[in-house]
Amino acid sequence: MADQAYEPRLKTEYRERIRKSLKDRFGYSNEMQIPKLEKIVINMGVGEAVADSKKIQSAMADLAKIAGQKPVSTKARTSIAGFKLREGMTVGCKVTLRKDRMYEFLDRLITIALPRVKDFRGLKPTSFDGRGNYAMGLKEHIVFPEINYDQIDQIWGMDIIVTTTAKTDDEARELLKEFQFPFVQQ
């Protein structure tokens, strides 16, 4: 048992069940045609960082706890006088998850975080971009179990983008349904 490598639950499920299901449903002739998850990008926009640079450090620390890896800061591309924003100022942070960390995060998102969202009815099945990628937003980062409510100074929102190798939205939707994404029934 000690020499056996750990594999995330969803990765094992993809390899053993989901690949076969998608191959049967879409009739792929080649194993490499079967859609798979490529990466998950988590982005936090911290507009308040313009006035107080300590807020970006707090957001980065929280995002590091959620993702399990160190985020990078995102900088403003252009100056906007109305927001007192200059080009190059730090306005947020993001992290890109791949391989095992991606599957671990997805498991926590589906089984723990989304059910804890207030008034959660399901994810919109129309939030695909036309190329097989899914984008969603969370208003509160405190739905993740890694965040202790008593130790945070502010509640942040985040964008979560799931990038797949699927060519169409229908293929990506079926892939995410197989991963038990809680889509709203149309």
Curated annotation (Swiss-Prot):
Say if the entry is tagged with keyword RNA-binding: yes
Recorded coiled-coil stretches: none
What does the entry give for GO biological process?
translation
Q: Which domain of life is it from?
A: Bacteria
Q: Which GO terms describe its molecular function?
A: rRNA binding; structural constituent of ribosome; tRNA binding
**Keyword annotations from UniProtKB, A to Z:** Ribonucleoprotein, Ribosomal protein, RNA-binding, rRNA-binding, tRNA-binding
Q: Which GO terms describe its cellular component?
A: ribonucleoprotein complex; ribosome
SUPFAM superfamilies, per database record: RL5-like
Q: Does the keyword tRNA-binding apply?
A: yes
State the protein's purpose.
This is one of the proteins that bind and probably mediate the attachment of the 5S RNA into the large ribosomal subunit, where it forms part of the central protuberance. In the 70S ribosome it contacts protein S13 of the 30S subunit (bridge B1b), connecting the 2 subunits; this bridge is implicated in subunit movement. Contacts the P site tRNA; the 5S rRNA and some of its associated proteins might help stabilize positioning of ribosome-bound tRNAs.
Subunit and interaction comment: Part of the 50S ribosomal subunit; part of the 5S rRNA/L5/L18/L25 subcomplex. Contacts the 5S rRNA and the P site tRNA. Forms a bridge to the 30S subunit in the 70S ribosome.
Entry-linked HAMAP family: Ribosomal_uL5_B
Query: Member of which family?
Result: Belongs to the universal ribosomal protein uL5 family.
Q: Which PANTHER family match?
A: 60S RIBOSOMAL PROTEIN L11-RELATED
- Name under which the protein is recorded: Large ribosomal subunit protein uL5
Organism annotation: Phenylobacterium zucineum (strain HLK1)
